[in-house]
A protein has these predicted regions:
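Bacterial N-terminal signal peptides
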Residues: 12-22
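Short secondary-structure boundary/capping segments
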Residues: 134, 238, 323-328, 458, ...
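N-terminal secretory signal peptides that target proteins for export/translocation
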Residues: 1-9
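Exposed, low-structure sequence patches enriched in small/polar residues
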Residues: 385, 466, 470-473, 477-765
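Alpha-helix capping and helix-loop boundary segments enriched in small/acidic/polar residues
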Residues: 284-285, 328, 380, 410-418, ...
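Structural preference for beta-rich elements and adjacent junctions enriched in aromatics
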Residues: 27-429, 437-438, 450-451
Length: 765
């Protein structure tokens, strides 16, 4: 088919410069630092300081045989007074490089089984603490918090992230070269206590929770504290804005940890499950009950490797996916939520999944060769039976390795057969922050008689944090090839990225080609037969001593897709006319987007409305976005987007209300409305979400999630109760109910409902 070439591009770039801030007459003075009169742990020691090469160091103190730590947040054991603290935190914001206005001290001690941390967060106004959240792994964008990272391998690339707040919330993540995995749940424990000097934390991290080299007594470590009411972030080391806590190469050093044990490195985690369900929408109206059991085994064959075996796997306790409205030609992306696949997921990351799309305006062209939601879930997101899975992740010498094999079972009630899935990933660390790697995936049905699908790939990433002195620079490239029966050509994809992610200037360029028959069977791609070019440039100055404005952002991006003959398919120009971040933590932005799109196939945008093949559209849209500070009892955010849309117009409104009635009691309301008027027809979409949370303690919570959207015409309700009896031992009660809009009866009818009760227990050896 002949593809029409567009004429001379008329990039109607909108240029608007809004530099309308007024410098403050006088610089704000930082709050004076005061030392509380009463302390539970006297600050009589000098804080840990710089070691060799200027790296800040501290020493962990070993408990005597007759000493122990009681987790109560009091820090009243004698060893806490003997331990030398890490102190002298420096501000990242708002006054970069100045001492923190509220001091923080961190002490580390250990015994043969666990690492203990004692943290004092001094506060000159101790009654003004902010700690709304208590539920495990909730975000802390609204709260005071204390965060820390541990680089147990001292490689400057990987590590563990932890955070807590004054209400005792515990959150964690795995850090890797391609990002972080927030879904990782390590087994650790902590207690918090608030008093007239501020708030204190007493933390216990079993060595069995961490992978590390027992021959090395030096770990990378860093700490950061947020005082939310002041908008102040301070850090122990690496306070330059280009450095950031999660960049492990900026961490300090803790020494003295030796003669410790990970035990036998064996965790056995059995579960028991009881369910009752009915599916009137599928012809099964009676509630039917069932009971099942399974087990997860975790074993460390070496201190640096972790093996996992799961048998009769079930994920009844996971949260439901958050609904999305799709008005594009591309598939929506829903993240993985199942524990087995999330544990160690960073070892399978591949360089093509950079997710460099700006504001979602470029069509979200993600290329992921291994996407674990392809395993054990139908195209509609319904769970399929997983008989067993095995996984090995960790380090072997200079290599990061990930091996995975999963077998799914036949489903007699659906048109699915059992399959085998295999993934192998290796990355060799080179230089200080770089790697080269390879990937292999295989997917094959056991009974279909059709040969398996394969994907092979290689990637490389080179990074430095010392470009031009103290700037970050990253560059990477990748190549992939898929193989499936009956396809012998045009099966590849390849691309490259250059990234300059810094505080004042942010620049990026992505380029990729996806050939016609490229199809990673265990992957995620939105389309094939295209080339993509996507430059981005942002300028983000910080007005000096301005009384209200913390940072401004101006910038733009171009996201262009062509076919393999370089004929234009889509071109999106997105301009941030201005974004303003205030000291009050309120933010707003104004932006404009121009998009040119040629339809290489008919586009059914809504029921009964199809845009024709070959049509070319050029349209401009404008958006205003704003949000109030999350630290407030009522936080509001919203977006208004107006302008042309394909052959007509579209108005989109989004409103989010977050009501924090008291610590642990929340109500979240979300609404999204689209009003679309096209030559081919008009339609509206609506999406609503109501989430109510009751967090009884950091270890017990009840969450209600109600969602409705007009595209699916389904009301979904999930209630999820979780009780962490002790870390690693959980009780879940989950009720899910879906109603389908029945226009014939003019009411909603039950489509399916399910109740599940699940108990998990961890035995550690």
């Amino acid at each position: 088919m002949h593809i029409r070439r567009p004429g001379v591009w008329r990039l109607r770039l909108i240029v608007l410069v809004l530099l309308t801030y007024v410098p403050a007459a006088t610089a704000q003075k930082s709050a004076s630092e005061t030392q509380p009169a009463e302390q539970q742990v006297a600050s009589t020691h000098e804080s840990s300081g710089a070691g060799e090469g200027g790296r800040r160091t501290m020493t962990a103190l070993r408990l005597a045989d007759d000493e122990s730590i009681v987790l109560d947040g009091r820090l009243d054991e004698p060893i806490w007074s003997r331990a030398v603290p890490a102190a002298g935190f420096i501000q990242i914001d708002p006054f970069n490089g100045r001492p923190a206005t509220e001091p923080t001290e961190v002490r580390i001690v250990f015994d043969g089984d666990a690492l203990y941390m004692g943290v004092i967060c001094y506060d000159s106004e101790p009654d003004r603490w902010i700690g709304y959240q208590m539920r495990r792994d909730e975000g802390l964008g609204s709260d005071d918090r204390f965060m820390w990272t541990i680089d147990t391998f001292l490689d400057g690339r990987t590590g563990y992230f932890f955070e807590m707040n004054p209400s005792g919330l515990m959150a964690d993540a795995l850090l890797g070269m391609n990002g972080q995995n927030r879904e990782w749940d390590g087994i650790w424990n902590a207690r918090v206590r608030r008093s007239e000097i501020g708030w204190t934390l007493e933390i216990k991290i079993p060595f069995r929770t961490l992978n590390f080299n027992p021959e090395s007594d030096g770990w990378g470590i860093n700490f950061q504290r947020t005082v939310r009411r002041k908008g102040e972030d301070s850090i122990w080391t690496g306070w330059a804005r280009n450095q950031e806590l999660r960049r492990m190469n900026n961490a300090g050093l803790v020494t003295g940890i030796r003669d410790v044990t990970q035990g036998r490195g064996l965790d056995i985690k059995p579960y028991g499950l009881v369910t009752s369900e009915a599916s009137p929408g599928r012809g099964s109206t009676a509630m039917t009950g069932s009971a099942s059991a399974g087990v997860d085994l975790f074993y460390n064959p070496t201190p640096l490797l972790r093996a996992n075996v799961t048998v009769n796997t079930d994920f009844a306790q996971i949260d439901v996916d958050q609904r999305q409205v799709n008005l594009t030609r591309y598939s929506l992306f829903f993240p993985e939520r199942r524990d087995f696949f999330l544990d160690g997921a960073i070892f399978f990351d591949f360089g093509s999944d950079t997710d460099g799309d700006r504001q979602g305006q470029g069509g979200n062209q993600r290329i992921i060769p291994f996407f674990s939601r392809r395993i054990g879930l139908s195209a509609g997101g319904e769970p399929e039976r997983i008989d067993f899975g095995t996984k090995l992740t960790g380090q072997v010498g200079a290599q990061d390795v990930g091996l995975l094999h999963v077998r799914t079972g036949d489903n007699d009630g659906a048109d699915t057969v059992g399959e085998d899935f295999t993934v192998a990933r290796i990355k060799r660390r080179v230089l200080e922050q770089s790697y080269i790697g390879a990937l292999y995936t295989r997917r094959g049905a056991r009974t279909s008689g059709i040969g398996p699908d394969h994907t092979v790939g290689a990637d490389a990433r080179f990074a430095t944090s010392t470009f031009l002195g103290d700037q970050n620079l990253e560059a990477g490239g990748w190549v992939l090839s898929s193989s499936r029966p009956g396809v012998s050509s045009d099966r590849s994809a390849f691309g490259a990225t250059v990234n300059f992610p810094n505080d004042r200037w942010i620049a990026r360029f992505d380029a990729a080609e996806v050939q016609e028959h490229f199809d990673p069977a265990i992957g995620f791609v939105t389309r094939s037969s295209y080339r993509r070019y996507a430059p981005t440039l942002d300028f983000a100055p910080r007005p000096s001593n301005h009384p209200y404005i913390r940072q401004l952002t101006f910038g733009g991006s171009v996201d262009m897709l062509t076919d393999l003959e370089n004929d234009l398919l889509t071109r999106t120009v997105d301009l941030t006319l201005i974004q303003v971040n205030l000291h009050s933590q309120d933010n707003f932005s104004v932006a404009a987007t121009n998009r040119r799109e040629w339809l290489d196939e008919p586009f059914g945008i809504s029921q009964g409305i199809t845009l024709p093949l070959g049509a070319v559209y050029d349209f401009t849209r404008y958006r205003v976005w704003g949000q109030t500070a999350n630290r407030r009892i009522l936080a509001v955010s919203g977006r208004l987007e107006i302008g042309d849309f394909f052959s007509g117009t579209r108005t989109e409104r989004v409103l989010n209300l977050n009501l924090r009635l008291r610590p642990g009691l929340f109500l979240y309301l979300t609404g999204q409305w689209n009003n679309v008027r096209l030559r081919e027809g008009s339609f509206t979409t609506q999406l609503y979400r109501i989430v109510g949370e009751t967090q009884f303690s950091p270890f017990m919570s009840l969450v209600h999630n109600i969602q409705y959207d007009t595209q699916s015409a389904v009301v979904g309700w999930q209630s999820r109760f979780r009780w962490i009896v002790t870390p690693g031992n959980d009780v879940y009660l989950v009720y899910t109910h879906n109603w389908l809009d029945d226009p014939l009866r003019n009411r909603f009818s039950t489509f399916d409902r399910r109740f599940a009760s699940k108990v998990l227990y961890t035995y550690r050896f």
